[in-house]
Every structure is written in structure tokens, then in C-alpha cells.
């Protein structure tokens, strides 16, 4: 057994110890990895890191495999297997920044760092910054395993397992299991098993939103069982377009498309297919896919987003993993993590100005659907009649003071606080992305991420360390 195989077993053991209360065996769920990602895959792909003149960076890699993964910012990785994952540290806090927690101000003494230890991340996005008030300078992922297309967004993850397309958003997780396509934004969870397809948002005692997909519906879109690879419509959709990414990762230098404005950032690791138009102050992240897409001024496409035969009018947030097909978004529409919005040429989807599509929403149309302006959208929609059970005007939601139940969607608490919280966050995302850049002020990712220098690193190709990457310290 070489050192990489021993590393795999070591990580599995640590995850299992952390989840022993659930009688959970990560090895059974991750057994497919040894077929899905055999050793030849782990030595086939290089890792790469980005350097800018504006983003602090300090990389440390030891006793790890980093095949196909991307790093930006301050990152420390020890005893880990990261396969085609994105560790994007462009929103980490800097030395001297001040944060406020429950009325108390803290000033950071150090630049914040992402630390990944004793973990397996497969096609996983890590982004944002630590939301742990006890450790504001450390974004920690430890003794954890995540499966394809999970998102770890501003979330401490310690001793956890994340299923396919699961999202941990602004939540500190300790000894938890996030089921397939589960989404949590709850502040903190200890020793909880969040069911497959559950969308759960909680803000202390102010409000709580909860919805769960019917299991039969969810299984068609993403299915994950012991010893099997993830399968379903989501996987088929991605696999169908996989070959287009191969060229951009194989090429050393690629000329950017001529139509990119100076105030826009288009990653050289994004796919841009014919008939695509990109406006000003737009951010297109690595592993995004655009085909016959119109992105108006201030729009964005984050990691693992697919925008096909669709039009975004402007100032649209398309969060990590969202997919839009034959969809028209009016201005200021928010589409959440891993949402799947698929119309057709005969059955397009229109979403009105200012509407909020909740994370992990599935709209897969059999008839044309038009969602009015300023509505909240969730759940599973195929035809216009579904809207009465899966949408609610933001005005009506803001009027809720105690609770609101619509079929399996349950909301309790202050509706106005919920709407205000979402509006505030969307505004922050647009500002961070540089949507409001006027040529001098309000710079963001769209302007700051334009001149990234990419550098590649490769693993040992033979011997007992085959598949491991050399220990590296990379400093300014």
C-alpha cells in the first residue's frame, strides 16, 4: 500500500470517529471513489494556484494530493485529498480588519487563512471567509469528507460528511451529516443529520425557513447510495458538457475572447461557447460554462454555473453551482446555490425583477412559466399551477409575524427580517463582485481578478509517494 492509499484510510478513519454517534461508515459511501477516482486520475491532473498583486497569499501544501484543484489566497493543506476542488480565498479577511459580533468589535492581528486538514474534498467549492467569532482568522475544514459539487461557503466544517450537491452556507458544522442536495444556513449545528433535499435557514429566534423535496422527485435529479457513484439528471447535465472543459485545462495559454469589457473578469478556466455576450462589471469564475448567454452589466456566473440560451438583464447574482437554461432574468434577480432552472425553447422561464430564487430550487418546465417581480421561489416547479405552492410575494412574506405554511414549506418568525436579510446579502454580493464599479470607485472581484498569474504544480509520478504532491511553501 503506497502513502496515498494510507492517507485515504487515515482520513476515512477520522471522519468515522467524528460521526460515530450516527453509526456512519464513510468508507462505504466513499468506496466508489477508488473506482471513480483511481490512482491514475490522481496523478493525471496538475493543481494550480493564482497570484495577484492585490490579494495576500501564502500557500503551504504537505502530504496531500491536489489533483485538478485551484487555490487563491492564504491556504494551508495537510494530509488531504482534494480532487478538482476550488479553494477560493479572495474574500478572506485581512490583518487590521474589524469584525463585530453581538456588539463587540474585534480587530484581526493576522491575515485570515483557509486550513484544510485530514479531509477529502471531491469537486467541492470553498469560498467566502470564516464566520466563527472565536476564530475569525481561521477558515477551518478538518476531519471532513465532501462529495461532488458540494459547497462550503463561509462555514467551519469539522468532523462532517457532505453529500453530493450539499451546501453549508455561513454555518459552523461540528460532527454533522449533510444529506444529498441539503442546504443549511443556520449559524451553527452540532451532531445533526440533515435529511436529503432539506433546505433549512434559521437566524436565531428571528426567523426559520424549512422545505424538503419529495424523495421520489429528488432521486430523479440526484441519487446517491452506498457503494455507487452519484447519478441522475444533475450528473447527466454536467457530464454532457464535460469535454468542453478539457481543452481549457489542457492548454497553457489561451487568448481571451475579444468581447470582454475592461471592467469585467472572465476566468481563463471558464468555458465560453458561441453567441455569448458579456457586459461591463461582470464576474465569470473558473469552471463556469456560458453558451448563447447574455450577461448584462453587473451580472455574474460563479463556479460550476451553467448559463445556456439564457439572458440576464443585469445586476443578477447566479450563486455557486446554479444552472440556467432557456431562462430570462429581469434585473436584480437572485438565483441561489445549486439551483436548477431549465426551460426549453418552447417552454421558457421568465423571472421578474427583484425576485429571489432560493438555494436548491428545481424548475424543470413542461409548460412556459412567468414568475412575477419581487417573489420568493422555492421547491419544485414544472408548470404555472405549481407557482401557488412554491412562490410567495415578498410583500406578503414581509407581513408575516408568526408563521406561514404552504404545503411542505414552513416559515416562522419575522418575515420582514427574512426579506431584509436576503436583500442585504444580495447587495453585499453585488458590491463584492464589483457590479457598481464606476471607473474609479467600488472595485470588486470583476476588476481585481482580471490579472491573475496561474502557476501549476504536479505530483510524484512513481515510487512510494506516487500521487502525493511535494511539500511546498509558496510566499510572496
Specify the residue positions occupied by each region the protein language model found.
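Extended low-complexity, polyampholyte segments enriched in Ser/Thr/Pro and acidic residues
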Residues: 2-19, 30, 35-53
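Glycine-rich hexapeptide-repeat left-handed beta-helix
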Residues: 9-31, 86-141, 148, 152-157, ...
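Extracellular beta-rich repeat passengers
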Residues: 43-44, 49-67, 71-72, 76-81, ...
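Eukaryote-specific, low-hydrophobicity, charge-rich regions
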Residues: 46-47, 55-61, 240, 244-266, ...
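Short, conserved secondary-structure segments in the cores of folded domains
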Residues: 73, 112, 254-256, 268, ...
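Beta-propeller domains
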Residues: 261-292, 296-298, 302-303
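Transmembrane alpha-helical segments and their membrane-interface loop/helix boundaries
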Residues: 447, 452, 464-467, 471-476
